[in-house]
Protein backbone atom coordinates (compact mmCIF):
# COMPACT_ATOMS: atom_id res chain seq x y z
CA UNK A 1 0.00 0.00 0.00
CA UNK A 2 1.25 3.44 -0.88
CA UNK A 3 1.80 6.55 1.22
CA UNK A 4 -1.29 8.80 1.29
CA UNK A 5 0.63 12.03 2.00
CA UNK A 6 3.10 11.40 -0.83
CA UNK A 7 0.15 10.54 -3.05
CA UNK A 8 -1.53 13.83 -2.22
CA UNK A 9 1.59 15.71 -3.34
CA UNK A 10 1.64 13.74 -6.59
CA UNK A 11 -2.05 14.52 -7.14
CA UNK A 12 -1.48 18.24 -6.57
CA UNK A 13 1.55 18.27 -8.91
CA UNK A 14 0.29 16.02 -11.70
CA UNK A 15 -3.51 15.71 -11.53
CA UNK A 16 -5.24 18.64 -9.83
CA UNK A 17 -4.97 20.94 -12.83
CA UNK A 18 -7.54 18.70 -14.59
CA UNK A 19 -9.30 16.76 -11.78
CA UNK A 20 -11.09 17.32 -8.46
CA UNK A 21 -11.71 14.62 -5.84
CA UNK A 22 -14.23 16.02 -3.36
CA UNK A 23 -17.96 15.28 -3.32
CA UNK A 24 -19.70 17.84 -5.50
CA UNK A 25 -16.38 18.92 -7.03
CA UNK A 26 -16.66 20.37 -10.49
CA UNK A 27 -15.45 18.76 -13.67
CA UNK A 28 -12.43 20.50 -15.14
CA UNK A 29 -10.64 19.32 -18.28
CA UNK A 30 -11.02 15.88 -16.72
CA UNK A 31 -13.89 14.52 -14.62
CA UNK A 32 -14.38 14.85 -10.88
CA UNK A 33 -13.02 11.65 -9.33
CA UNK A 34 -15.31 11.40 -6.27
CA UNK A 35 -16.52 7.80 -5.80
CA UNK A 36 -14.06 6.64 -8.48
CA UNK A 37 -13.45 3.19 -6.99
CA UNK A 38 -16.13 0.78 -8.15
CA UNK A 39 -17.28 3.06 -10.98
CA UNK A 40 -17.00 2.01 -14.61
CA UNK A 41 -14.98 3.98 -17.16
CA UNK A 42 -16.83 6.88 -18.72
CA UNK A 43 -19.52 7.17 -16.04
CA UNK A 44 -18.94 10.42 -14.10
CA UNK A 45 -22.28 12.15 -14.41
CA UNK A 46 -22.21 15.35 -16.44
CA UNK A 47 -18.80 14.79 -18.04
CA UNK A 48 -18.37 14.39 -21.80
CA UNK A 49 -16.26 11.28 -22.42
CA UNK A 50 -14.81 9.87 -25.62
CA UNK A 51 -16.39 6.70 -26.99
CA UNK A 52 -13.14 4.91 -26.08
CA UNK A 53 -13.63 5.69 -22.38
CA UNK A 54 -17.32 4.77 -22.43
CA UNK A 55 -16.71 1.52 -24.27
CA UNK A 56 -13.68 0.30 -22.27
CA UNK A 57 -16.11 -1.17 -19.75
CA UNK A 58 -13.73 -1.81 -16.86
CA UNK A 59 -14.43 -0.97 -13.24
CA UNK A 60 -11.95 1.33 -11.53
CA UNK A 61 -10.04 -0.28 -8.69
CA UNK A 62 -6.45 -0.50 -7.48
CA UNK A 63 -5.33 -2.89 -10.24
CA UNK A 64 -7.03 -1.10 -13.14
CA UNK A 65 -5.83 2.33 -11.96
CA UNK A 66 -2.30 1.00 -11.46
CA UNK A 67 -2.17 -0.13 -15.08
CA UNK A 68 -3.99 2.94 -16.46
CA UNK A 69 -1.81 5.47 -14.64
CA UNK A 70 1.36 3.97 -16.11
CA UNK A 71 0.27 4.84 -19.66
CA UNK A 72 -3.32 6.13 -20.09
CA UNK A 73 -3.25 6.23 -23.90
CA UNK A 74 -2.03 2.63 -24.10
CA UNK A 75 -4.65 1.38 -21.63
CA UNK A 76 -7.53 3.29 -23.28
CA UNK A 77 -6.55 4.14 -26.87
CA UNK A 78 -8.60 7.18 -27.88
CA UNK A 79 -8.84 8.70 -24.39
CA UNK A 80 -8.64 12.49 -24.35
CA UNK A 81 -6.46 12.40 -21.23
CA UNK A 82 -3.20 13.96 -22.41
CA UNK A 83 -1.20 12.93 -19.32
CA UNK A 84 1.80 10.77 -20.29
CA UNK A 85 1.58 8.56 -17.21
CA UNK A 86 3.58 7.75 -14.09
CA UNK A 87 6.33 5.23 -14.72
CA UNK A 88 7.49 4.75 -11.11
CA UNK A 89 5.57 1.96 -9.37
CA UNK A 90 5.94 3.57 -5.93
CA UNK A 91 4.50 6.86 -7.18
CA UNK A 92 1.49 5.05 -8.67
CA UNK A 93 1.02 3.16 -5.39
CA UNK A 94 1.15 6.45 -3.45
CA UNK A 95 -1.28 8.20 -5.79
CA UNK A 96 -3.75 5.30 -5.64
CA UNK A 97 -3.56 5.27 -1.82
CA UNK A 98 -4.42 8.98 -1.82
CA UNK A 99 -7.22 8.60 -4.37
CA UNK A 100 -8.73 5.71 -2.44
CA UNK A 101 -8.99 7.89 0.65
CA UNK A 102 -9.77 11.28 -0.93
CA UNK A 103 -12.46 10.12 -3.37
CA UNK A 104 -14.41 8.22 -0.70
CA UNK A 105 -15.09 11.21 1.59
UniProtKB/Swiss-Prot annotation:
Chain segments annotated as transmembrane: none
Binding residues annotated for heme c, in chain numbering: 15, 18-19, 81
Natural source organism: Varanus varius
N-acetylglycine: modified positions: 2
Keyword Transcription regulation on entry: no
GO cellular component terms attached to this protein's record: mitochondrial intermembrane space
Subcellular localization, as worded in the UniProt entry: Mitochondrion intermembrane space
Main function: Electron carrier protein. The oxidized form of the cytochrome c heme group can accept an electron from the heme group of the cytochrome c1 subunit of cytochrome reductase. Cytochrome c then transfers this electron to the cytochrome oxidase complex, the final protein carrier in the mitochondrial electron-transport chain.
Keyword line: Acetylation, Electron transport, Heme, Iron, Metal-binding, Mitochondrion, Respiratory chain, Transport
Top-level taxon of origin: Eukaryota
Modifications made to the protein after synthesis: Binds 1 heme c group covalently per subunit.
One Pfam short name: Cytochrom_C
Annotated family: Belongs to the cytochrome c family.
Single GO MF descriptor: metal ion binding
Signal peptide region: none
Name the record gives this protein: Cytochrome c
Amino acid sequence: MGDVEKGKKIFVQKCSQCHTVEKGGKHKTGPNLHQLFGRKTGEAEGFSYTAANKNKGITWGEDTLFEYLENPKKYIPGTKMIFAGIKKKTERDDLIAYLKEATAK
